[in-house]
């Protein structure tokens, strides 16, 4: 089951509803619906970027998850999880956070972002949550992330490698960008195929 977070994709909610608490509630509702409708047993979360951060946090907050697949998660501790807003100057991210928390919201990247998101990001540490939940976890990053710092990637890789059933897969995605795409069509197709096959194989192993 796939879901769009508030203000994203097919969601009809305003982007100001894009907060970690709302996203957590949305995931819980989706899992409940899936289990009631399809009678599923074990449940895994697959998340990309901010979705990967939320997937990392969710088991600690709500439980009931068997495995995680994290595609390029934005797992920097606290506000470092928002580093993509200005990857070259983190002080600018801190200034945006202060403004948003003081005024209730700010406009950036063409959307209105709630101060609540910055506060909840500041108070969250997804890699600490991964260590605590210690679930089977697949982690992938590409060779050209761009909007995620080398530090965030290295710290997250180290955490997943330390887990009893952690698996880090990097090589098939060396030519991809943060969205696992490439301007070269053949490379893009290979990235898509590798991501799907790697994820499916991992989930089959731990959900069967």
Where are these regions (language model features)?
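Conserved alpha/beta-hydrolase
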Residues: 1-12
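Active-site acidic short loop of glycosyltransferases
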Residues: 39-41, 134-135
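The alpha/beta-hydrolase serine catalytic core
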Residues: 64-166, 171-200
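Gly/Ala-rich beta-loop-alpha elbow adjacent to hydrolase catalytic centers
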Residues: 47-51, 55
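Short beta-strand immediately N-terminal to the catalytic nucleophile in serine-hydrolase-like folds
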Residues: 45-47, 71
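C-terminal alpha-helix
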Residues: 33, 198-206
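Active-site signature of alpha/beta-hydrolase-fold catalytic machinery across serine-
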Residues: 57-61
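Alpha/beta-hydrolase active-site loop
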Residues: 17-36
């Amino acid at each position: 089951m796939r879901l769009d977070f508030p203000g994203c994709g097919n969601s009809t909610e305003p982007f100001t509803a894009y907060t970690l608490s709302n996203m957590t509630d949305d995931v819980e509702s989706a899992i409940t619906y899936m289990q009631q409708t399809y009678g599923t047993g074990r449940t895994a979360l697959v998340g990309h970027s901010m979705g990967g951060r939320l997937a990392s946090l969710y088991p600690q907050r709500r439980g009931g998850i068997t495995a995680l697949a994290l595609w390029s998660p934005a797992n920097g501790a606290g506000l470092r999880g928002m580093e993509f807003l200005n990857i070259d100057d983190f002080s600018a991210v801190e200034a945006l956070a202060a403004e948003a928390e003081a005024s209730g919201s700010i406009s950036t990247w063409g959307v209105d972002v709630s101060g609540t998101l910055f506060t909840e990001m500041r108070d969250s540490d997804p890699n600490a949550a991964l260590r605590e939940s210690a679930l089977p976890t697949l982690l992938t990053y590409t060779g050209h992330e761009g909007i995620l710092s080398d530090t965030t990637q290295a710290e997250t890789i180290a955490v997943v490698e330390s887990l009893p059933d952690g698996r880090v897969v990097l090589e098939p995605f060396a030519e991809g960008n943060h969205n696992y795409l490439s301007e070269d069509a053949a490379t893009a197709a290979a990235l898509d195929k590798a991501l799907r096959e790697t994820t499916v194989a991992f989930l089959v192993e731990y959900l069967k």
